[in-house]
Regions:
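Central mid-sequence intracellular linker of multi-pass
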Residues: 18-87, 270-297
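Glycine-rich segments within core transmembrane alpha-helices of 12-TM secondary carriers
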Residues: 1-20, 25-37, 101, 134-143, ...
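Flexible cytoplasmic loops linking transmembrane helices in multi-pass membrane transporters
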Residues: 53-107, 154-167, 171, 180, ...
Length: 322
């Protein structure tokens, strides 16, 4: 949700800054914040809690008791089983679900201000505020959905698989339907803003679907899975602007934007339906692929045939007879 928080902080302020000082000032401000954040990251972040210089004993104990990990100091790092990952149907269902999620994010991030300024006819300063509203809603609802998910897990009301698939209608299906409904509002500014805000806001439930599913499938390789899914999903950042630019190149009106919203709606809904049928919330067998292989390579145990066992039994009977 860091991207949503950044958008909420950036757009309302930069809209006015661009009107006052131009794009160069806005770009310089964003670049400065990014560099400052990078320096802070290198200074603060460590590989694991145990090596962090600022962590207290009580906090470290709390984390250690609640986080299960098989990694130990000096342990050999295992390469991800890429072949098994790429052959995994639940993994590709996750990739598609994440692609749909990223489409919604990048569509409103890149095309939202264009729609608000040129179709709804707002000035740039107000555009920044209005364009940030959907991301503020997403950030708030993500926290709420996260608490709901934790409660469900704690009470064991639903399995992980049921949670992931059960919240897909909220994170993907409903946002897609709301984008389609938005095309019926015409030039009604209030309804357009409300529906777009609610659409992306409900996508905050992605904290219980595509943003968590990589850890469900393979806790040992969750970073790799999410990295692949996010890489492919980020392609929407240049695909959706190309589509918007093509459809609005000759005329930037409601008819063209209706088509754009229908495309976004279709991607949302299709990705959710595919995950329903092919996704999973269970740990996959290839998560412990190397451990399974090692169990077969047992060292120091003598191979004994059934014939040898029979011979030993006969020898024992002879000794008892004597």
């Amino acid at each position: 949700m860091g991207g949503s928080l950044g958008t909420v902080c950036t757009w309302p302020t930069l809209g006015w800054a661009i009107e006052a000082w131009g794009w160069s000032a806005a770009l310089a401000a964003c670049g400065g914040v990014a560099l400052g954040w990078t320096a802070l990251w290198w200074w603060v972040v460590r590989d694991c809690p145990a090596t962090h210089p600022w962590i207290g004993e009580e906090e470290l104990k709390y984390i250690s008791e609640r986080v299960q990990t098989k990694e130990t100091a000096g342990a050999k790092k295992r390469l991800p089983p890429y072949k098994a990952i790429l052959k995994s149907t639940p993994f590709w269902a996750l990739v598609i679900l994440h692609f749909g999620n990223m489409w919604g994010l990048f569509f409103l991030l890149t095309a939202g201000p264009n729609f608000i300024t040129n179709v709804l006819a707002f000035d740039l300063g107000h555009t920044g505020i209005l364009a940030a509203l959907p991301y503020l809603a997403r950030l708030i609802l993500a926290l709420i959905f996260g608490q709901i998910g934790d409660l469900i897990m704690k009470k064991k009301w639903m399995s992980k698989d049921a949670i992931r698939k059960g919240f897909v209608p909220i994170s993907h299906i409903l946002p897609g339907l709301l984008l389609a409904i938005q095309t019926l509002t015409g030039c009604d500014v209030n309804w357009a803003i409300v529906l777009i805000t609610l659409s992306l806001g409900l996508n905050g439930a992605s904290t219980l679907t595509n943003l968590q599913n990589a850890h469900d499938l393979a806790p040992n390789f969750a970073g790799t899975l999410y990295g692949i899914a996010n890489c492919l999903g980020s392609a929407t950042g240049f695909i959706s602007p190309i589509i918007v630019g093509y459809l609005t190149s000759t005329h930037n009106g409601l008819h063209e934007w209706h088509t754009i919203f229908y495309i976004g709606s279709s991607v949302y809904i299709a990705s959710g339906i595919i995950f329903w049928f092919f996704g999973s919330g269970d740990v996959q067998s290839w998560n412990d692929l190397e451990e399974t292989a090692n169990k077969r390579d047992v060292v120091g145990i003598e191979n004994v045939s059934f014939d040898d066992v029979e011979v030993d039994k006969n020898d024992k009977k002879d000794r008892e007879t004597r």
